[in-house]
Amino acid sequence: MMIDVEIKITDNEFLRQFESVINEELVIVEYSQQERKVFLTKLKMPEVLKDGGYLEPFLEALLGYIQEGTHKVVPTNPEIAKYMRKNRRKYKDLLPVGMNI
């Protein structure tokens, strides 16, 4: 079940995290950068949002935001990796050369 909601992603470079506010709840993905790779390390989403079906729309918005730039994505967080694996055709160009998930 996909929720149809517009999700705005903000890059908080000082805290090294992508942020979004959904239904007045803060969602965070912590990251680190090396060369031209973004390592998505930790996802913090309130259970009420996960239970409400907001995880996939949030990850779609996040990966779309990253896709606009020139970085590749290394999903070290299991939930993000699972989502990318499920949608591998859509996001295969975001993975570094030679990396499979």
Language-model region placement:
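Non-catalytic substrate-recognition and accessory regions of acyl/acetyltransferase enzymes
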Residues: 1-48, 65-74, 81, 98-101
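Short, compact, well-ordered microdomains
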Residues: 73-94
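Generic detector of low-complexity/intrinsically disordered segments
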Residues: 61, 96-97
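Conserved acetyl-CoA-binding loop-helix of GNAT-fold acetyltransferases
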Residues: 50-64
